[in-house]
C-alpha cells in the first residue's frame, strides 16, 4: 500500500479552470429555454440568470471559509465531520459515491456519444464502448499526473468557452431588439410577476452547480488560504457573466414564444443567424461534446478524492486511500470509481433511476452550509479567510439550498424519500462496520 500523502501541486489558474470547467456543462444547452418558459419575459429571463448567479456567491463564501479552515481533500465529508457528526459525514460520502459520483461519469460519457451520433450514425452497443473508452482515457490521464490533468483541464476549459464567445459575438451582431418588445408568454403565474421571476431563478439553479468541486482537492492546492476564496468566488462571477450574456443574445436572436417552448434553445437560436443557418445543429453538437468532455475530465479528476479522504480516516475501503508511489495520485480510487462508472454505462436503466437521489444530494449541501455554524463554535477553528457579513451570507446560502431541496421534492417526492431511506438503511450499517474497525485500528496503533 502506498502510504505517502498527496502533495500540493495545483495553482490558482488550474483550480479556476476546474471550477469553471465543472460548472459549464451540458445543462446550459437546455436551461435557457426552461428559464424563459418559467420567467415569461425576455428581461426576466436575463434577470433570472443574474440573480441566480448572485445567489450562489454566499454559498461559495461558506465553502471558501470552510476550505481554508480545513485545507484537506474531501469537501462536504470533511466539513460535516469537523462540525461534530461523523455519521452524517459518512452518509454524505456514501451517497455521493454510489448515487452521484460514479453515475455522473456514465451519464456524461453517454451524452458525449449522443452528440457524436448527431454527426454520424453510431450503433448503440458501439456507443457504450466509446463512452467506456472515454472514461478509461481520462482515468489514465488523471492517474499519471495531477499537473498534467490540471493542464488539460485548463486547455479544455478555454476550448469550451471559445464557442460560447463566438455565439455571443454573432448574437450581438444579429441581435433583434424587437424580440424584447414582443408580447410575453403565458408562463407560470402572472407574466412579469415576482413569482414568475422566482420560478426563473429556480430554473437557473442547476446551471450554477459545480464550482465547489475544487473543495474535493483542497489538500492538493497551493496556498489554499488565498487560492480557494479567489477561485470559488471568481469562478462564480465568470460563469454568471457568461450565462447572462448567453441569455441576453439568445433572447434577442429568436422570438420569445419560440424560445420559451424550445428544448434546444441554443441550437434553435443559431438557426436565426444567416451565417450559420442549417449548420447550427452541427456547431452545437461539436460544442456540446467539447463542453461535456471538460466536465467529464474534471469529475474523473476531483471525485475520487472524496473516497480517498474517507479511506484515510478508516471509514471506507482501505485500498481507496492508496497513493501511487511515482505519480502521487489516488490511483486505486480513480480506477475503482471509473470502473463503477463504466458498469453504469451498461446498466442504463439503473442509471436513470439514480436521478431520484438528487433530493438526498441537495439536502447534503444544505447540511454542509449549516455545518459552518457548528464549526465556528470550535476552539480550534481557525480559517484563513472568513465569510463577510457571516449571518446574512450563511442564511442566504442555507435558504437558497433549501429552496432547491423543496423544488426537487416537488419534482419527485416519493422516489426522493425512498432514495433517502435507501441511503440511511445501507449507510448506517456500513458506518457502524467501519467505525468499529477504525476504533480497533486506533487501539492497535
UniProtKB/Swiss-Prot annotation:
Transmembrane segments: 10-30, 38-58, 93-113, 121-141, 155-175, 181-201, 236-256, 273-293, 334-354, 355-375, 389-410, 417-435
Membrane topology qualifier: Multi-pass membrane protein
InterPro entries: AA/rel_permease1, AminoAcid_Transporter
GO CC terms: plasma membrane
Record's keyword annotation contains Plastid: no
Major localization listed first in the record, in broad terms: membrane
Alphabetical list of Pfam families matching this protein: AA_permease_2
Consequence of gene loss (knockout): Cells lacking this gene are unable to grow on fructoselysine or psicoselysine, where they do grow on glucose.
Keywords on record: Amino-acid transport, Cell inner membrane, Cell membrane, Membrane, Transmembrane, Transmembrane helix, Transport
GO biological process: amino acid transmembrane transport; fructoselysine catabolic process
GO molecular function: L-amino acid transmembrane transporter activity
Catalysis performed (reactions): N(6)-(D-fructosyl)-L-lysine(in) = N(6)-(D-fructosyl)-L-lysine(out); N(6)-(D-psicosyl)-L-lysine(in) = N(6)-(D-psicosyl)-L-lysine(out)
Keyword Cell inner membrane included in the entry's annotation: yes
Annotated pathway: Carbohydrate metabolism; fructoselysine degradation
Cell location: Cell inner membrane
Induction data: Induced by fructoselysine. Makes part of the frl operon with FrlB, FrlC, FrlD and FrlR.
Its biological purpose: Is likely involved in the transport of fructoselysine and psicoselysine to the cytoplasm, where they are degraded.
Family: Belongs to the amino acid-polyamine-organocation (APC) superfamily.
NCBIfam families assigned: PRK11357.1
This protein's name: Probable fructoselysine/psicoselysine transporter FrlA
Amino acid at each position: 500500500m502506498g502510504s505517502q500523502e498527496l502533495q500540493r501541486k495545483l495553482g490558482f489558474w488550474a483550480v479556476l479552470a476546474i471550477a469553471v470547467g465543472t460548472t459549464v456543462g451540458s445543462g446550459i444547452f437546455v436551461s435557457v429555454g426552461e428559464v424563459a418558459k418559467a420567467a415569461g419575459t425576455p428581461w426576466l429571463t436575463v434577470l433570472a440568470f443574474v440573480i441566480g448567479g448572485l445567489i450562489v456567491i454566499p454559498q461559495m463564501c461558506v465553502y471558501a471559509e470552510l476550505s481554508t479552515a480545513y485545507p484537506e481533500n474531501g469537501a462536504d465529508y470533511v466539513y460535516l465531520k469537523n462540525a461534530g457528526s461523523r455519521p452524517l459525514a459518512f452518509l454524505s460520502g456514501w451517497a455521493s459515491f454510489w448515487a452521484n459520483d460514479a453515475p455522473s461519469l456514465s451519464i456524461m460519457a453517454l451524452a458525449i456519444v449522443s452528440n457524436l451520433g448527431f454527426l454520424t450514425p453510431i450503433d448503440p452497443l458501439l456507443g457504450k464502448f466509446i463512452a467506456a473508452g472515454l472514461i478509461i482515457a481520462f482515468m489514465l490521464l488523471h492517474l499519471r499526473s495531477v499537473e498534467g490533468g490540471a493542464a488539460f483541464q485548463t486547455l479544455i476549459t478555454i476550448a469550451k468557452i471559445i464557442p460560447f464567445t463566438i455565439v455571443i459575438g454573432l448574437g450581438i451582431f444579429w441581435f433583434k431588439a424587437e424580440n424584447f418588445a414582443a408580447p410575453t408568454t403565458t408562463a407560470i403565474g402572472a407574466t412579469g410577476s415576482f413569482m414568475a421571476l422566482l420560478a426563473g431563478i429556480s430554473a437557473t439553479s442547476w446551471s450554477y452547480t459545480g464550482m465547489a468541486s475544487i473543495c474535493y482537492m483542497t489538500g492538493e492546492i497551493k496556498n489554499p488560504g488565498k487560492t480557494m476564496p479567489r477561485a470559488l468566488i471568481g469562478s462564480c462571477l465568470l460563469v454568471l457573466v457568461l450565462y447572462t450574456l448567453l441569455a441576453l443574445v439568445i433572447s434577442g436572436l429568436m422570438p420569445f414564444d419560440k424560445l420559451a417552448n424550445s428544448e434546444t434553445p441554443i441550437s434553435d437560436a443559431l438557426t436565426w443567424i444567416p451565417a450559420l443557418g442549417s449548420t447550427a445543429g452541427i456547431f452545437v453538437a461539436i460544442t456540446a461534446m467539447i463542453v461535456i468532455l471538460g466536465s467529464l475530465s474534471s469529475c474523473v479528476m476531483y471525485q475520487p478524492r472524496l473516497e480517498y479522504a474517507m479511506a484515510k480516516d478508516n471509514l471506507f475501503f482501505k485500498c481507496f486511500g492508496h497513493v501511487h508511489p511515482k505519480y502521487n495520485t489516488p490511483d486505486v480510487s480513480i480506477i475503482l470509481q471509473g470502473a463503477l462508472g463504466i458498469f453504469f454505462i451498461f446498466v442504463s436503466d439503473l442509471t436513470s433511476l439514480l436521478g431520484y437521489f438528487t433530493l438526498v444530494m441537495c439536502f447534503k449541501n444544505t447540511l454542509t452550509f449549516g455545518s459552518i455554524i457548528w464549526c465556528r463554535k470550535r476552539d480550534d477553528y481557525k480559517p484563513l479567510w472568513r465569510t463577510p457579513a457571516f449571518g446574512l451570507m450563511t442564511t442566504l446560502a442555507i435558504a437558497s439550498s433549501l429552496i432547491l431541496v423543496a423544488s426537487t421534492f416537488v419534482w419527485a417526492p416519493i422516489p426522493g424519500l425512498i432514495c433517502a431511506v435507501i441511503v440511511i438503511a445501507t449507510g448506517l450499517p456500513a458506518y457502524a462496520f467501519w467505525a468499529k474497525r477504525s476504533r480497533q485500528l486506533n487501539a492497535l496503533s
